[in-house]
From Swiss-Prot:
InterPro entries: bZIP, bZIP_Maf, bZIP_sf, Maf_TF_N, TF_DNA-bd_sf, Transcription_factor_Maf_fam. Its main location: nucleus. Residues 54-76, 169-194 have a biased composition (Low complexity). Residues 226-251 are annotated as: Basic motif. It is found in: Nucleus. Residues 254-275 are annotated as: Leucine-zipper. The lineage of its organism: Eukaryota, Metazoa, Chordata, Craniata, Vertebrata. This is Transcription factor MafB. Residues 157-168 have a biased composition (Basic residues). Expressed in bursa, gut, liver, spleen, bone marrow and brain. One of its GO terms (cellular component) is nucleus.
């Protein structure tokens, strides 16, 4: 009964320790009865071996009740070395080191050093409670950033003077750092007007899309969209101007060609008129020659002195 009371007194209430103990399956070990004369000694040993308790539906079992007894704990001290080796092999088989990834030496050291593990767990729980208390005060200070150091000092918490002073100071420094970041961002990214003025119209029109994207790295999306819209407007304006210029050039070319054709037509008309006059002249001349020929033929036929007349 005294051993059970001592076990209950040394059980930690930490959930982490409870979860640590629940990972071990203690129901697969056999129960070995110990002599009555060694109950007190084995009870004290069990209090050292069990680091934490577990509240579960399984019956409470201790490592001492499931692990075979050590040769030093047996009632008769006349155990041979062969029996010692048998106890070590039997305990190694029952503890299932494959599941725990332990060697026989690690299993013995784990059973012996379990009391130190419980002390470390208790120290961790105390550190965890202190950290939670510090985090609670820090969260409380961030909820009320306008409270000054003098107000906190006068509120009746002098033992947290250093913590509140340490957390109250970052408020102006945070604002100053944010303002410096904004100034740096403004220096790195000038306003939209300066971004548009950074490139001339000729540069925007003559620059390729890949080169423009390389120059626009680091600017905001709105500035990039605005600059690309300006470039598209300039491109469309250039296209319209080039088309208008081409149309004007084509119009001038057609007008010149028309003038030349009109001149050629006039020249051809004049040539036709000249040829018509020449034709008429040649026609009159031909008619004259024809009439003269008929007259000469008639005069020769009426002459009696012709040699044919006397024949």
């Amino acid at each position: 009964m005294a051993g059970e009371l001592s076990i209950g007194a040394e059980l930690p209430t930490s959930p982490l320790a409870m979860e640590y103990v629940n990972d071990f399956d203690l129901m697969k070990f056999d129960v070995k009865k110990e002599p009555l004369g060694r109950n007190d000694r084995s009870g004290r040993h069990c209090t050292r071996l069990q680091p934490a308790g577990s509240v579960s539906s399984t019956p409470i079992s201790t490592p001492c009740s499931s692990v075979p007894s050590s040769p030093s704990f047996s009632p008769t001290e006349q155990k041979t070395h062969l029996e010692d080796l048998y106890w070590m092999a039997n305990s190694y088989q029952q503890m299932n080191p494959e599941a725990l990834n332990l060697t026989p030496e690690d299993a013995v050291e784990a059973l012996i050093g379990s009391h130190q593990v419980s002390q470390q767990l208790q120290g961790f729980e105390s550190f965890r409670a202190h950290h939670h208390h510090h985090h609670h005060h820090q969260h409380h200070h961030h909820q009320y950033p306008a409270v000054t150091h003098e107000d906190l000092a006068g509120s009746g918490h002098p033992h947290h003077h250093h913590h509140h002073h340490h957390h109250a100071s970052p408020t102006p420094s945070t604002s100053s750092s944010s303002s410096q970041q904004l100034q740096t961002s403004h220096q790195q990214h000038p306003p939209s007007s300066s971004v548009e003025d950074r490139f001339s119209d000729d540069q925007l029109v003559s620059m390729s899309v890949r080169e423009l994207n390389r120059h626009l790295r680091g600017f905001t999306k709105d500035e990039v969209i605005r600059l690309k819209q300006k470039r598209r407007t300039l491109k469309n304006r250039g296209y319209a101007q080039s088309c208008r210029y081409k149309r004007v050039q084509q119009k001038h070319h057609l007008e010149n060609e028309k003038t030349q054709l009109i001149q050629q037509v006039e020249q051809l008309k004049q040539e036709v008129t000249r040829l018509a006059r020449e034709r008429d002249a040649y026609k009159l001349k031909c008619e004259k020659l024809a009439s003269n020929g008929f007259r000469e033929a008639g005069s020769t036929s009426d002459n009696p002195s012709s040699p044919e007349f006397f024949m």
